[in-house]
Amino acid sequence: MKLCRWYIALFLLPVCLQSQKLPTRDEELFQMQIRDKALFHDSSVIPDGAEISGYLFRDNPKRYFFVVEEDNTPLSVIVTPCDAPLEWKLTLQELPEEASGEGSGEPEPLEEQKQQIVNEEGTELFSYKGNDVEYFVSSSSPSGLYQLELISTEKDTHFKVYATTTPESDQPYPELPYDPRVDVTSLGRTTITLAWKPTPTSSVMKQPIQYCVVINKEHNFKSICAVEAKMIADDAFMMAPKPGIDFNPFDFAHFGFQSDNSAGKDRNFMPKVSSSKMLRQITKPKVDIQKFCIGNKNIFTVSDLKPDTQYYFDVFAVNAVTNMSTAYVGTFARTKEEAKQKTVELKDGKVTDVFIKRKGTKFLRFSPVSSHQKVTFSVHSCLDAIQIQVRRDGKLLLSQSVEGVRQFQLRGKPKAKYLIRLKGSKKGASMLKILATSKFNKQPFPSLPEDTRIKAFDKLRTCSSATVAWLGTQERNKFCIYKKEVDDDYTEEHKKRDQNQCLGPDTRKKSEKVLCKYFHSQNIHKAVTTETIKGLQPGKSYMLDVYVMGHAGHSVKYQSKIVKTRKFC
């Protein structure tokens, strides 16, 4: 039993009429299809045993047809909505019987056959409205012309249709196990483990199956078709063609779509525009959805999730031969809350050392005296930049990235409490010093210029000395220079390890100290000082460090500089 493949014949008919006589009934039936716009407007034909994809414009029905030529034929029709719910119905019209013509085999005249079909309204066999993957199955269907009509009243949408007259042997969709649920077997703050029972299509029928897991924060999906439509909703090539952009109105009329002004307004048809402007108009934001195809494993751990967040999980069994899929019953779960951290209390005017793990977070609290006009936060980030947020009684006052030394002064409020949130670097662990005070005094950390690099003068380099310069500020500070011999293969990794700006001169050997001096300049543009480091060995590499000392004894280190003396002089 076959579904009639009319779409091939429709294209070949004009050529065949000239060179070869088609069977009489088929030829007349095809001609009737072409002329009968009431029945076959924008029509398509469903092939037997193949899944087809289609696109619906909102409120514009689409019809598919197939012929069952013998009675008592098994029949299965499956419709898969993608982007939006569908309304669809399946109707049957009996085919006109061929007259014997006194044994001549001549059929009834074409007009009589056509009139019989047109006069028959057909019998509705099944109808459905929703976004589920829905089936029509019959073990014994009568012969006749079957019409599948689909419409989307919500929005333009994709869909899939599959029909077969041999449902027992085809089975292109994987079969679900007796318990088709997806179970959550393990739950953490950033990970969730899922498990499900294998499909009999793999374990019993030995067909190649792979499982695809889909994770998102919105809802469960009922088909891979719906997942893929959501994932690529912002791709221009997936958008429905629009008159004036992809087709002109004549093309649309040719394909069976109305092209009058009212229809254009309903679908927001636009005049001809440039491709770049068109892409800006139709581009949608990307959806937060992930899809993993994991082979034939039926256990999967999802990682890198956010704490205290609800996620929806779906599993699809995919036939590797037909690429057709079946959805398990999805589930949802909320990750555990972030472990509540102990909040450190800051004492007024005292420097506190803070260590933060990679990508970690620390919370500090500051409760100044009840009556205060201003609050000052001084932060010294020892390694990479860190993020700081300050809230006063829940209201966000400050959100900044801090590298080096920064000072923030905020307006106070009687009896206010301040919560400080510190977020570490993605590169590695973070270290910092922080001071909070409601008193007006000198900050604990010395002021720094914007550029904390040390410059070496190559032309002034000798076999036993190196001349360097660095910037200062308008504030009088004490600067100390230290030197350390390093190997020629001293790498950036070693340099990074030595770049902790919070380690002061007290961690250095006395033999490494070169000198200390005071320096400042009222003219910020002339705040430059130079120094010649002597007593070096020929052809050797040295790491030079400059420390600037604060009023409270806290120091800040400039960026280290590697210099190499001349080997021959």
From Swiss-Prot:
GO terms for cellular component: extracellular matrix; extracellular region
Single biological process term from Gene Ontology: positive regulation of cell-substrate adhesion
GO molecular function: glycosaminoglycan binding; heparin binding
Signal peptide span: 1-19
InterPro entries in UniProt: FN3_dom (IPR003961), FN3_sf (IPR036116), Ig-like_fold (IPR013783), NDNF (IPR019326), NDNF_C (IPR045805), NDNF_Fn(III)_1 (IPR055271), NDNF_N (IPR056225)
List of glycosylated residues: N323
Subcellular location: Secreted
Protein name: Protein NDNF
